[in-house]
Swiss-Prot record:
The species this protein was found in: Mycobacterium tuberculosis (strain CDC 1551 / Oshkosh)
GO biological process terms, semicolon-separated: cell wall organization; peptidoglycan biosynthetic process; regulation of cell shape
Gene symbol of the encoding locus: ddl
Pfam families from the UniProt entry: Dala_Dala_lig_C, Dala_Dala_lig_N
Enzyme class, broadest EC rank: ligase
Cofactor: Mg(2+); Mn(2+)
Protein's UniProt name: D-alanine--D-alanine ligase
Entry's family note: Belongs to the D-alanine--D-alanine ligase family.
Length: 373
């Protein structure tokens, strides 16, 4: 459909959320916040939930059902709506069809998909590949950048190859579960042990003695067979949002800071899942109190990191600010959009309100279209 045709009516947006990853619930909460803030005068919104088992269902787009209430996490349940599929056929023009196979009734047709999916089977290039095959424009990074951004090892490799500062790390692939002596000496203690392709701090452990490493690796492997062991970096935790405009230019937001020292009374606390989403315990400063020159240097590093992995649309780049300068921790190609998430808060502090931010992402997706760029 042409841009002129879309001007005559509201743009039809499919917000896709949930999914098969262990970040299912946070995806639901992000989607609830997005559904609440999309401008209904400009966008006709369809909510598509993916169950933990992988079924796609057409839901009623009620954002109130997609919140954390009394520490209870939301979930897309089987039978909560009509099951559907997106045929990988560009001739179908973004049609969502009913299941079971053979029914084929066209339920909806969409102009653009907003894949609010966190973790594997969504944020990692898989749904982006499906949308490319189906010929449907979508918000956010393409297949390559999504896959790279999901994998902490390859993110660090690409950033380092581009001359960007990253911390020391080692990778454990099955069946290996221990570090070599030289790796232990290079990393030092403490270290953080993480699923290499995970997010929301799920499965992450802080290890302060090497005898704790096997248990930490086993915990991480409940979520991903590949484990990354990162040297602890002493410094302030800063974040920066990058946003692509419809004309392809990139802008970086004001910085945000996460302060977690002593959270829940422990000096070894870190920004784990409970601190992020359940306990409301971390302190978030937006804008961060950082010298103007340092802040601008970090903003430029964020844009360079975005370009280094060939990202598109949006990303949140996480840093440590050390005595020796900033170090890039990771890139989130589909950051959280919950009510407490840093990405929309940083843009709000930069003068871009939530509805405008979402509209810009959708406009950029439509301007980009699909295919090779």
């Amino acid at each position: 459909m042409s841009a002129n045709d879309r001007r005559d009516r509201r743009v039809r947006v499919a917000v896709v959320f949930g999914g098969r990853s262990n970040e299912h619930a946070i995806s639901c909460v992000s989607a609830g916040s997005i559904l609440r803030n999309l401008d209904s005068r400009r966008f006709d919104v369809i909510a598509v939930g993916i169950t933990p088992a992988g079924s796609w269902v057409l839901t009623d787009a009620n954002p109130d059902a997609l919140t954390i209430t009394n520490r209870e996490l939301p979930q897309v349940k089987s039978g909560s709506g009509t099951e559907l599929a997106l045929p990988a056929d560009p001739r179908r023009g973004g049609q969502l069809v009913s299941l079971p196979p053979g029914a084929g009734e066209v339920l909806e047709s969409v102009d653009v998909v907003f894949p609010v999916l966190h973790g594997p089977y969504g944020e990692d290039g898989t749904i982006q590949g499906l949308l490319e095959l189906a010929g449907v424009p979508y918000v956010g990074a393409g297949v390559l950048a999504s896959a790279v951004g999901m994998d902490k090892e390859f993110t660090k490799k690409l950033l380092a190859a581009d001359g960007l500062p990253v911390g020391a790390y080692a990778v454990l692939r099955p069946p290996r579960s221990t570090l070599h002596r030289q790796e232990c000496e290079r990393l030092g203690l403490p270290v953080f042990v993480k699923p290499a392709r995970g997010g929301s701090s799920i499965g992450v452990s802080r290890v302060s003695s090497w005898d704790q490493l096997p248990a930490a690796v086993a915990r991480a492997r409940r979520h991903d067979p590949k484990v990354i062991v990162e040297a602890a970096i002493s410094g302030r935790e800063l974040e920066c949002g990058v946003l692509e405009m419809p004309d392809g230019t990139l802008e970086a937001s004001t910085l945000g800071e996460i302060r977690v020292a002593g959270v829940r009374g422990r000096e070894d606390s870190f920004y784990d899942f409970a601190t992020k989403y359940l306990d409301d315990a971390a302190e978030l400063d937006v804008p961060a109190k950082v010298d103007d020159q340092v802040a601008e240097a970090i903003r430029q590093l964020a844009i360079r990191a975005f370009a280094a992995i060939d990202c598109r649309g949006l990303a949140r780049v996480d840093f440590f600010l050390t005595d020796d300068g900033p170090v890039i921790n990771e890139i989130n190609t589909m950051p959280g959009f919950t009510t407490i998430s840093m990405y929309p808060r940083m843009w709000a502090a930069s003068g871009v309100d939530y509805p405008t931010l979402l509209a810009t992402m959708i406009e950029t997706a439509l301007a980009r279209g699909v295919g090779l760029h």
